[in-house]
A protein has these predicted regions:
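N-terminal pre-catalytic "stem/leader" segment of glycosyltransferase-like enzymes
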Residues: 13-234, 533-534
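A nucleotide-sugar donor-handling region in carbohydrate enzymes
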Residues: 138-154, 284-353
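Active-site and donor-binding regions of nucleotide-sugar-utilizing enzymes
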Residues: 174-318
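Conserved catalytic-core segment of nucleotide-activated headgroup transferases in glycan assembly
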Residues: 179-201, 319-398, 508-517, 534
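Short acidic-hydrophobic, aromatic-tinged amphipathic segments that line or gate anion-handling sites
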Residues: 221-229, 313-315, 409-418, 470-488
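Donor nucleotide-activated moiety binding/catalytic core segment of transferases
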Residues: 388-441
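Catalytic binding pocket for nucleotide-activated donors in carbohydrate/polymer assembly enzymes
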Residues: 438-507
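C-terminal amphipathic helix plus adjacent low-complexity
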Residues: 490-534
Length: 534
């Protein structure tokens, strides 16, 4: 059992964490802290001068030193933040280095300023004028590096704000992730820009700025925030901006959501039954864009009660690129099957990936007499273990592809993962094998059959926990009966009508590019509608 001292320390640490969190994410809390600390410093100065007057009647030196001291301590009592930088914004030169180099640590100077501020208050109250002058001079020396860095920050923010005012963006696409950017940002940027309005991307991870931009090749200007995101965005949220969009569940987005003059809209990066599609953090958003009624039902099913009026149903704009089946699967002589396993998640609770048994799945597909398009989640390419594993899995398809005694014509590796979009992979395939993934929801637009591998639940619980599975064929993690299930899907397909019904629940009534056009029109409307809070 923890001691009393340990409990006190734990409570203190929790309170400090709460205060820091509010300072980083809440404008009103930050303003209150600023006013409170300023009032405290002024009060300390007044007390010191009053004591001085009582001691020897001297006023001029005490008042002058107190005023200068309060200003110096107020300006230099916190570490200076690293400045933001921007790429692709007219009027602002490209940075020479990305990410920007870390500035020198001013922590020791900040600590010195605080202690010297206390010493100055004592000196003003009791010490001779010469001592007051010495302490004040030391305070000025300690504050100088901090103030110099803060001046650099102020100039950077001012130049960026001026350029943004001239550019007149209507929306911000906030991104606090890292490796998933090519998928998450790339998924939505074209559809946001189709509104005809200008926007900017705000990235919260400066160390990934160069990597993300190289992979995404964004059409919008990219702002990489400094270490004080909320401070940057208070100045960079220019009057033309009405809406912030979010495609990722990064906790860092709370810093952006501290800006209350705009509306905050959740887009997500795919419709699935993973926790990221029904997170309690979504309660904070002003508007949630959902593809269909199934998305709203998902929140309710998981106890996340969000008022219905905060949802807007716009289908999946990306599904317009997915073509419907030209021929029923039962009439295709040699079907092509897309195997698209999801990634392994951030932990056990979010790990639904079938990659652990991918070799057995690929082998079963080859034995079923189909061609295979193997497109694992791109995150696997960045992990050393999975990169080696992918080499082994690709070799299975390579061997069958190169064997003159087999008719197999497969796609894998760079061609399938980076050369083709997800929609292209879908359009080249007649059936899908996946797990708990938004790929399945998008696949519904094709009306083609799909098989889902349940890595966590038994099959009865799987259909209940993941409703989209009801329109597909299912096997458990042991792949029990996989050959028979594949045969049923490829040669009889009794679930065709169920898929058509499920498509409306998941993707809405939209056909073709109707969802994309509805989304861009809605974005344009939001971009030109100022946010008014009660």
């Amino acid at each position: 059992m923890p001691t009393l001292l340990e409990r006190v320390r734990a409570r203190r640490d929790r309170r400090l964490h709460e205060v820091r969190h509010l300072f980083r994410t809440d404008v009103s809390s930050r303003d209150r802290w600023f006013l409170g600390s300023s009032a405290g410093l002024i009060a300390a100065g007044v007390v010191a001068v009053s004591v001085r007057v009582l001691v020897d009647g001297s006023l001029v030196v005490g008042v002058a030193a107190a005023v200068v001291g309060v200003l110096l301590v107020r300006a230099a009592m916190l570490r200076p933040a690293t400045p933001p930088h921007v790429h692709g914004l007219p009027g602002v030169p490209e940075p020479e280095v990305c990410p920007a180099p870390e500035p020198p640590d001013r922590g020791p100077f900040v600590v010195a300023v605080r202690w010297l501020g206390a010493a100055l208050a004592f000196a003003v109250a009791f010490a001779p004028a010469a001592v007051v002058a010495v302490v004040l001079a030391l305070l000025a020396v300690a504050a100088a590096p901090v103030l110099r860095d803060k001046a650099v920050l102020w100039r950077a923010r001012r130049a960026l704000r001026r350029a943004l005012v001239a550019y007149e963006p209507r929306f911000v696409l906030g991104y606090g992730g890292y490796g998933g950017g090519p998928i998450h940002v790339g998924m939505w940027e074209p559809h946001l820009l189709a509104s005809g309005d200008r926007g900017v991307i705000v990235g919260l991870r400066g160390h990934y700025c160069a990597e993300l931009r190289a992979a995404i090749k964004p059409a919008m200007p990219w702002i990489s925030t400094g270490s004080d995101v909320l401070g940057d965005m208070r100045g960079l949220t220019v009057p033309s901006v009405t809406t912030f969009f979010y495609v990722h569940n990064a906790p860092g987005h709370l810093k952006l959501m501290g800006i209350r003059s705009v509306r905050h809209v959740w887009l997500g990066h795919g419709d699935s039954d993973k926790a990221g599609s029904h997170h309690k953090r979504h309660l904070r958003y002003d508007v949630l864009v959902a593809s269909g009624e199934a998305a709203i039902d998902r929140y309710t099913r998981h106890g996340v009660e969000i008022p219905r009026e905060r949802f807007v149903l716009l289908g999946r704009p990306q599904s317009g690129e997915v073509l419907p089946a030209a021929t029923p699967i039962t009439e295709v002589a040699r079907p092509t099957v897309l195997y698209a396993p999801t990634w392994t998640g951030n932990g056990k609770m979010t790990n639904f990936s079938s990659m652990y048994i991918a070799d057995r799945i690929l082998t079963a597909l080859l034995e079923a007499g189909v061609d295979v398009v193997f497109r694992p989640h791109p995150v696997f390419l960045r992990d050393a273990y999975w990169a080696q594993r992918l080499t082994e899995l690709n070799a299975i398809l390579q061997a069958d592809h190169d064997d003159p005694s087999t008719p197999g014509r497969h796609a894998w590796g760079e061609e399938a993962v980076r050369g083709w979009s997800v929609a292209e992979c879908m359009n080249r395939s007649d059936a899908l094998v996946s797990d708990v993934s938004s790929v399945v929801s998008d696949w519904l637009a094709s009306a083609k059959p799909y098989l889902m591998v349940s890595m966590v639940h038994d099959l009865d619980a799987f259909a209940e926990a993941v409703p989209v599975a009801a329109g597909g064929y299912m096997v458990d993690r042991d792949l029990t009966g996989l050959p028979e299930v594949l045969d049923e899907m490829l040669h009889r397909d009794p679930l065709a009508e169920k898929r058509r019904q499920l498509k409306v629940q998941v993707l809405g009534e939209y056909e073709g590019d109707e969802s994309a056009r509805a989304f861009s029109a809605w974005v344009h409307e939001m971009a030109h509608t100022p946010m008014v809070r009660a």
